Each structure stands twice: as structure tokens, then as C-alpha cells.
A protein has these predicted regions:
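Transmembrane beta-barrel architecture of outer-membrane proteins
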Residues: 42, 101-103, 148, 193, ...
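A glycine-/polar-enriched beta->alpha junction
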Residues: 45-55, 62-77, 91, 105-123, ...
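Short segments within alpha-helical structural elements
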Residues: 203-225, 376-434
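Bacterial Sec-pathway N-terminal export signals of envelope proteins
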Residues: 21-84, 227, 233-269, 319-320, ...
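Bacterial N-terminal signal peptides
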Residues: 9-19
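Small/polar, glycine/serine/threonine/aspartate-rich low-complexity segments that form flexible
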Residues: 25-37, 82-112, 119-120, 125, ...
Length: 460
């Protein structure tokens, strides 16, 4: 039994050594990937031009500017030119005649005081600011989603690479155990355990390969084209950390410049202007009218010599009673203002919560990365010790397989922790109101454009 155990132990060590010599596995089968490499910044630039959410938000922001200009136009002089030609036929006891009359007029009207119109302009001015902030918020949200899908692709490819590497190691061990079993130098239980593990890993490879395709399709949805290039991966030579800023500093920064918060602040201004515009229905309006008219038609449609008339007038309109509709509208607008203020409070609380959550999670992830590296090193030592113990007959094949599985699991945990950290940093920057391009540029420095397919080597 000890001889068999030593032989199998040597086989496990040999299989791991062969797998290590092979290095990183080739690109995932079933996924078309070119020899080119792209990174997060490049995909961000493409998404800015292709993501429908970003394009729609820009269109709404531009529309807001035009609506503001439209409201401004109602405050400026309104000039109209009128022209008319009439055919008139007159009969009486003395005369019967027909003639053509012509009327030309130029009229200018200008509000001297109209509270409703002025406050309506202020409302659309605030709405334009709100649309701009919402466009920036949409871009920030889309950037976080892009980063999340980017690292989901990396995680899926890593998972496939790790499963394939584990499958290779286990398959080589199974091949040699089968050869020894044919010579009655191995136990049937060791053979069956290895066979079951190989079959299970083969099924996992299919699922992992499918997940790679699905995750790349999700990334293509944002970019607007199939993403077939290799993706730049996280570097191992940089220290991942949030920043030297305190949590309180991040919160203050977010409350001051978060675009979602600014959009809701503008929403409160919109509601306030709408309320003041509604109250303007109780105020009088004062307007100036200037007109010039030329006509050959006089009183009672009489034909007269062509006459030029010039009129300047001031009109005053005082609302007295509108059936209570103006007061009801004001009360409704007041409730709208309260709702906008409460929405602002809700968003502000959410900003504080999201910043706190992202900061603490990223800070914990940074510490967890170091712990995961130690865990991986320990798992590698544990696997080596298990193989050595198997050689002395102290453990069985199941124990060795468990140690190998633990080593791959530790590698998965390390990679996942790195991706979670980067995603949380981008999320933190989003809620803190940092420009999306600046956030992506800082994260892109942590990526290595020359990294291999998954940057994963079979365990040592």
C-alpha cells in the first residue's frame, strides 16, 4: 500500500509540474478573440458615443436648453405683420358701388409686467440645469455599469481558465492512475474519485465557456459592437487602495457635487418657480402695444383715401375671479414643491449611504486582497504538503484533490476580490460626483495591456 501511495503521490506532483510548465491556458474556446487588446478607457470612449442611455440623456439636455430659449422668447417683444384685401359692394338709394379695400398693419407687443411669464422662464431655466445634471448622472451610471460588465468578463474568463487548469491537472493524474490500476498498483476508490472529479470539471468547463460568451454579449450591449479583443487585466505590481481621503471628506464631496443630488436641487428650484408662476395668476399684467396701419377702408366699410395710422397704448389686465381655479392650482403646486423637497432629502440620504457603503467595501476589499494573497500562498503549501503526505500513505487521493481544489478556490477569491475592489472604487467616484472620464483614467492605470489571456498559471 505504501508503494502504491508513493507512486500516486509522485504522479500528483508530476501532473502539477506538467500543468505549471504549460503556463496560462489559451483563450477560451467558442469565443472569437483577436490578437488585439483593449482596455477600460477605450471601451469607455466608445460607450460615450454608442450607449443609448448616454445619447438619450444628451438629447434631453439639449432639449432643455431649447425649452429655456422658448420660454425666454415670451419675455421679448412680439412683432406681427398683418395684411388683408377685401372686395366690398355697397348699395343705397343714391349710389351702388364696388371696390377693393386693403389693410396693412405692423404690431409690436411687449409685456412690461407679467409675473407668471417671468417665473415660467425661471422654471425652464432650472429645468435646463436639471437636464444637464441628469445627463451627467446617466453617464456616471453607465460608466459604473460598463466597469461592472468589463470585470464580469474578466472574472468569467478567469473562472474558465482555472477550471480548465484544474481539469488538466486532474486528468493527467487520472490517466496515470488508470495505467497503474491496470497493473493492480492503484485502488479502485482513487480511480473513481478522480474520474468523478474529471467529469464534474468537464461539465463546469461548458458552463464557464457559456458564461464567457454571455458576459461578452452583455459588454457588447453597452459598446454597440461585438467585443472580441482581449481585455487588459489587473496588474500585480501596483498596490490597490482607495485614497488618503477620509470617509467624511468623501461624503462632503459627494453632497457638494453629486450630479443626481444637483439634479434634484434643480428640481426643487423648478417646483418653486412653478409655484411662483401659479401665484402670478393673482397679479395684474401690464403690456405695451405699438402699431402702424395703412388702409383705404373707413367707417362702416366706406371707401376713403389711403390713410396711415400710428397707435401706442398701454394695457392693464387685473384678474378678479377665475372660479377658484387659480387658488386650487397654487395649492397643488405647493404640494409639488413639498414632494420635490422630500425627494431631494431622499437622494441626499442615498448619496451618503452609497458613498459610505462603497468606501467601506472598497477599503475592506483592499485589505482582503492582501489576506487573499496569503491564503493562496497557504493553499499552495497545503497542496504540496498533501501530495507529500500522500506519498507516505498518510492521506488518500480525496485529500489531495481537496487541497488542489482549495488552491484554485483561493486563486478565484483573490481575483474576485481585486475586481470587486476596482468596481467599488468606480462606484465610490460616481457617488462622490467625480467626472466619469477621470474615474476611468485612474482605474485604467491599474490594468496591464500586455497581460496574458487570463494572467493565470496552474498552481505550483
Amino acid at each position: 500500500m505504501q508503494v502504491t501511495a508513493r507512486v500516486l503521490g509522485g504522479l500528483f506532483g508530476l501532473a502539477a509540474g506538467v500543468a505549471l510548465a504549460q503556463g496560462a491556458v489559451p483563450a477560451a474556446q467558442g469565443v472569437s478573440a483577436s490578437t488585439f487588446t483593449t482596455d477600460l478607457m477605450q471601451l469607455y470612449r466608445e460607450a460615450r458615443l454608442q450607449d443609448p442611455r448616454i445619447l438619450a440623456s444628451r438629447a434631453r439636455a439639449q432639449a432643455g436648453q431649447e425649452y429655456q430659449r422658448e420660454a425666454m422668447g415670451t419675455l421679448l417683444p412680439q412683432v406681427s405683420l398683418n395684411a388683408g384685401v377685401n372686395r366690398i359692394h355697397q348699395e343705397n338709394e343714391l349710389v351702388q358701388q364696388s371696390f377693393d379695400s386693403e389693410v396693412y398693419s405692423l404690431v409690436l407687443r411687449q409685456y412690461l409686467y407679467n409675473k407668471s411669464t417671468w417665473e415660467n422662464y425661471q422654471k425652464f431655466k432650472s429645468m435646463a440645469k436639471q437636464s444637464d445634471s441628469e445627463a451627467l448622472e446617466a453617464q456616471s451610471e453607465a460608466t459604473v455599469e460598463l466597469a461592472r460588465r468589463y470585470f464580469t468578463v474578466l472574472a468569467a474568463e478567469d473562472e474558465l481558465e482555472l477550471i480548465q487548469a484544474e481539469l488538466r491537472t486532474t486528468q493527467k493524474s487520472l490517466d496515470r492512475v488508470n495505467a497503474l490500476y491496470a497493473k493492480q498498483l492503484a485502488l479502485i476508490t482513487d480511480q473513481l474519485d478522480l474520474k468523478a472529479r474529471v467529469d464534474g470539471l468537464a461539465a463546469q468547463v461548458l458552463d464557464a465557456r457559456n458564461q464567457v460568451s454571455v458576459s461578452r454579449a452583455a459588454l457588447a450591449e453597452i459598446v454597440g459592437r461585438p467585443v472580441k479583443e482581449k481585455l487588459s487585466r489587473a496588474r500585480d505590481d501596483v498596490q490597490l487602495r482607495v485614497s488618503t481621503q477620509s470617509l467624511e471628506s468623501w461624503v462632503r464631496e459627494g453632497v457638494a457635487q453629486n450630479p443626481a443630488l444637483k439634479a434634484n436641487e434643480s428640481g426643487v428650484e423648478v417646483a418653486g418657480a412653478a409655484l411662483r408662476s401659479g401665484k402670478g395668476g393673482h397679479y395684474p399684467t401690464l403690456s405695451l402695444t405699438l402699431s402702424a396701419q395703412q388702409s383705404n377702408e373707413g367707417y362702416n366699410n366706406a371707401l376713403v383715401p389711403r390713410t396711415d395710422s400710428y397707435v401706442a397704448g398701454i394695457g392693464l389686465q387685473v384678474p378678479i375671479y377665475s372660479g377658484g381655479s387659480t387658488s386650487a392650482r397654487v395649492r397643488g403646486l405647493y404640494q409639488d414643491q413639498i414632494a420635490a423637497e422630500q425627494q431631494l432629502e431622499s437622494v441626499q440620504r442615498r448619496v451618503v449611504k452609497e458613498i459610505t457603503s462603497a468606501y467601506l467595501t472598497a477599503d475592506t476589499s483592499a485589505e482582503k486582497i492582501s489576506a487573499s494573497r496569503h491564503a493562496l500562498a497557504s493553499a499552495q503549501l497545503s497542496r504540496a504538503a498533501a501530495e507529500k503526505a500522500f506519498g507516505y500513505g498518510m492521506v488518500n487521493a480525496v485529500d489531495v484533490l481537496t487541497s488542489v481544489r482549495n488552491e484554485y478556490r483561493a486563486h478565484r477569491d483573490l481575483l474576485k476580490t481585486q475586481y470587486d475592489f476596482v468596481t467599488n472604487v468606480i462606484t465610490l467616484n460616481r457617488w462622490a460626483g467625480k467626472p466619469p472620464g477621470e474615474s476611468v483614467a485612474s482605474v485604467n492605470l491599474w490594468l496591464n495591456p500586455g497581460s496574458p489571456a487570463a494572467g493565470i498559471a496552474d498552481p505550483r
